[in-house]
Swiss-Prot record:
Protein name: Recombination protein RecR
Lineage, broadest ranks: Bacteria, Bacillati, Bacillota, Clostridia, Eubacteriales
Gene3D superfamilies: 3.30.60.80, 3.40.1360.10, 6.10.250.240, RecR Domain 1 (1.10.8.420)
C4-type zinc-finger residues: 58-73
NCBIfam families, per the entry: recR
Entry keyword set: DNA damage, DNA recombination, DNA repair, Metal-binding, Zinc, Zinc-finger
Family recorded in the similarity comment: Belongs to the RecR family.
SUPFAM superfamilies the record matches: Recombination protein RecR
Residue ranges constituting the Toprim domain according to the UniProt record: 81-175
Source species of the chain: Clostridium tetani (strain Massachusetts / E88)
KW Zinc (keyword) present: yes
Domain of life from the UniProt record: Bacteria
Length: 198
C-alpha cells in the first residue's frame, strides 16, 4: 500500500541515497521541503544544480574548487615544502578547521583496498609521485586509522622514500577527554608509538 503520491515517494528515495540518511529521515526531509515556500525550494534546487555544475577538482591537489588551482594551492603564504596526503576532499576541510597545518594537500580519492578491488592504480598515487620534486621536504600521510588507511600509508612510504622525501604519519591514539580503561589495545599501542616528550 502506497502512502504517498509517486512524486513524494521518488523524493524520499532520492534523499535516502545520501550518506547517513535512512528512510525515516528521508521522509522527514521530504515533508519538510514540501512545506517550504516555493521560492525557498527553488533556491535550494538551484544551489544544488549550480554547485554540481561549477564545482570541480583542483588540477594540483584534487580538492573541490570553483577555480583552478584551488584557493589553497594558489595561496602564496602556504608552505610549498610540505604535502599532507588525505583520502577525500572532506578531510582537507577537517584538517583546515584545526588551524595547525599551513602546507599543501594531496587528495587520493580513496584508499588501497584489495577487498573492494581497489589497487594503487585506482587512486591518485601517480599524481602524488609527480608532485614530489626537490622542493618537497616532507609528506604527511593523514589517511584514516583503519586497515585500508594503514595499507595506503605503508604503500606511500614505500614508493616515496626512494625519491628522497621524508614521509611521516599523523599520530593516532586516545582522544582528548577519553579514559584509558575504554581504549582498545590497537588504539593504546598507537598512542604509545606516537608519544612525545613533554
Amino acid at each position: 500500500m502506497e502512502f504517498y503520491p509517486i512524486a513524494i515517494e521518488k523524493l524520499i528515495e532520492e534523499f535516502a541515497k545520501l550518506p547517513g540518511i535512512g528512510k525515516k529521515t528521508a521522509q522527514r526531509l521530504t515533508l519538510y521541503v514540501l512545506n517550504l515556500p516555493r521560492e525557498e525550494v527553488e533556491e535550494f534546487a538551484n544551489a544544488l544544480i549550480k554547485a554540481r555544475g561549477t564545482i570541480k577538482y583542483c588540477s594540483v591537489c584534487g580538492n573541490f574548487t570553483d577555480k583552478d588551482p584551488c584557493a589553497i594551492c594558489s595561496n602564496p603564504n602556504r608552505d610549498k615544502n610540505t604535502i599532507c596526503v588525505v583520502e577525500h576532499p572532506k578531510d582537507i576541510m577537517t584538517m583546515e578547521k584545526v588551524r595547525e597545518y599551513n602546507g599543501m594537500y594531496h587528495v587520493l580519492h580513496g584508499t588501497i583496498s584489495p577487498m573492494a578491488g581497489r589497487g594503487p592504480n585506482d587512486i591518485k598515487l601517480k599524481e602524488l609521485i609527480s608532485r614530489i620534486n626537490g622542493e618537497i621536504k616532507e609528506v604527511i600521510v593523514a589517511t584514516n586509522p583503519n586497515v585500508e588507511g594503514e595499507a595506503t600509508a605503508m604503500y606511500i612510504s614505500k614508493i616515496l622514500k626512494p625519491l628522497g622525501a621524508k614521509v611521516t604519519r599523523i599520530a593516532h591514539g586516545i582522544p582528548v577527554g577519553g579514559d584509558l580503561e575504554y581504549a582498545d589495545e590497537v588504539t593504546l599501542a598507537k598512542a604509545l608509538e606516537g608519544r612525545k616528550e613533554i
